[in-house]
UniProtKB/Swiss-Prot annotation:
Keywords: Membrane, Mitochondrion, Mitochondrion inner membrane, Repeat, Transmembrane, Transmembrane helix, Transport. It is a multi-pass membrane protein. It is found in: Mitochondrion inner membrane. The gene is mcfS. GO terms for cellular component: mitochondrial inner membrane; mitochondrion. It comes from the Eukaryota. This is Mitochondrial substrate carrier family protein S. The lineage of its organism: Eukaryota, Amoebozoa, Evosea, Eumycetozoa, Dictyostelia. It comes from Dictyostelium discoideum.
Length: 285
């Protein structure tokens, strides 16, 4: 992959990450609160309580943490995906199979996890702060306190489930996206890889890719959220231990707590991300 193409992927990924974040963050706040609540609570009740006690801004709690982090993470993700596709491609005239796209997406997700873990850690800690005394004054204060309590290791609390989610999730994410794109290109008689799709096709492809990403390994994300809001300087509880505890208390339903707002969020957020990504790539030439 040329340096120029890599730079374009990074720039487009950065802008796409911001679009995804602002579109989906309110739903993400509800997701994290449902996942980490000590008592079962409905989506609408959680939404109403947030608006009632914290105002509309409560839905955007923790948004400053992932803003620059997610922009950087999506830049790494798309640049990594582009690089992996080049490594897997036999020659320029042979398109990648969907399976190869899945592998490229999975390994790109592993790289993005390095950026994503501390960003999501801070975001989750801030999102579960509701009314009453606030331990963290903001994103920077939260990160500083985490580093004081646990050092770099503390900042990477939840790293293992994040890698698992990002590897498997991005395999599903990019393979679904590429499958949908190829379907629409065949339907519109646009066989070449460089042929542009219309906006509705990009929205559907990106939205379905996002839904696949969250569905394929959702219980691991629930465990990740639980692990990341747990505090202390000691080692994090294992994914298996957390999943067993959730299952013993709430059954299968507990493993999918917050799934509905996640899926509702995933379609518009990822539709926005891929549409903006493709638009920026087009503008950059």
């Amino acid at each position: 992959m040329s340096t120029e193409r890599g730079l374009k992927d990074s720039i487009a990924g950065t802008v796409a990450g911001a679009a995804c974040l602002f579109t989906g963050h309110p739903f993400d706040t509800i997701r994290v609160r449902l996942q980490t609540s000590n008592t079962p609570i409905g989506i609408m009740e959680c939404f109403r309580n947030t608006i009632k006690y914290e105002g509309f801004s409560g839905l955007y709690k923790g948004v400053t943490s992932p803003l620059f982090g997610m922009m950087f993470e999506t830049a790494v993700l798309f640049a990594g995906y582009g690089q992996m596709k080049v490594l897997l491609q036999k020659d320029e005239n042979t398109p990648l199979t969907v399976g190869q796209c899945a592998i490229a997406g999975g390994f790109a997700g592993v790289g993005a996890s390095v950026v994503l873990t501390p960003v999501e850690l801070v975001k989750c800690r801030l999102q579960v702060q509701t009314t009453g005394p606030q331990k963290y004054k903001g994103s920077l204060d939260c990160l500083v306190q985490i580093l004081k309590e646990g050092g770099i290791r503390g900042a990477y609390r939840g790293f293992t489930p994040t890698i698992a989610r990002e590897f498997v999730g991005n395999m599903a994410f990019f393979s679904t996206y590429e499958t949908c794109k190829r379907y629409f290109k065949n339907k519109e008689n646009k066989p070449n890889d460089d042929d542009e799709l219309n906006l509705p096709a990009l929205i559907i492809s990106g939205g379905l890719g996002g839904m696949a990403y969250w569905t394929v390994l959702y219980p691991v994300d629930v465990a990740k959220s639980k692990i990341q809001i747990s505090e202390g300087a000691g080692p994090s509880p294992s994914i298996v231990k957390v999943l067993k505890e959730i299952y013993s208390k709430e059954g299968v339903k507990g493993l999918f707590r917050g799934y509905t707002p996640t899926i509702i969020r995933s379609f518009p957020a990822n539709a926005a991300m891929f549409s903006v990504y493709e638009l920026v790539i087009k503008l950059l030439g």
